[in-house]
Amino acid sequence: MNIVVCIKQVPDTKGGVKFNPDGTLDRAAMLAIMNPDDKAGLEAALRIKDQTGAKVTVLTMGLPKADAVLREAMAMGADDAVLVTDRVLGGADTWATSTTIAGALRNMDYDLFITGRQAIDGDTAQVGPQIAEHLGLPVISYAADIKVDGDSVIVKRQYEDRYHELKAKMPCLITALSELNEPRYMTPGGIFDACDKEVTVWGRADLKDVDDSDLGLKGSPTKIAKASDKVAKGAGEKVNLDPAESVAYLIGKFKEKHII
């Protein structure tokens, strides 16, 4: 069984967000981490590997420095890694990104393809389902549990107020929630092994059945018009009054803010 996991190197937004003048994220000025939903998807794949002996390959699209998250994944237990990087792929929105990844996947053998639900630098949750559409694969999103059953997978899919249990024949695509599991840590031996392994690097020429018009910035139907950090909330006000005075004070504040 072959499992491919799509991971992404993203800025660690917990340390604050920085933007370029054109509204895009200033990734060079921020720490980079493996996207949390993707890491949960990787852990799910590694648990299937532990149970079945499956081969796990990690795939990412990004700058050459994204090699770091691929090596982190191999240190956790992934067998192989593929980096898709090329200048012509830069500036891609979700459509161009999914087109690129689908073009790479057409060169690979896989039974199961796992992505994270969404990346914390965009929160669109579009790339996984779009890849499935490009490749004609069944897709189950928002996975809270994944089990292999012969030539099928059984997935517990999270909804707002309930769970659905779904079964799909492989090959198929699953998008994983960060709540799916607690990802394992890298081991010292895994780190040494990951440093010795080679990462396969693919460029535009390695993408199969893809038109240049669907790649990178020029292949992106959407563009960032404006981006900004969250506006900090004002500090709360604490008052120490008796009940009658508190009511009068609150009514006055509500009127002042035109709430009543």
Model region roles, listed by residue range:
Residues M1-I260:
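N-terminal glycine-rich FAD/FM-binding segment characteristic of electron-transfer flavoproteins
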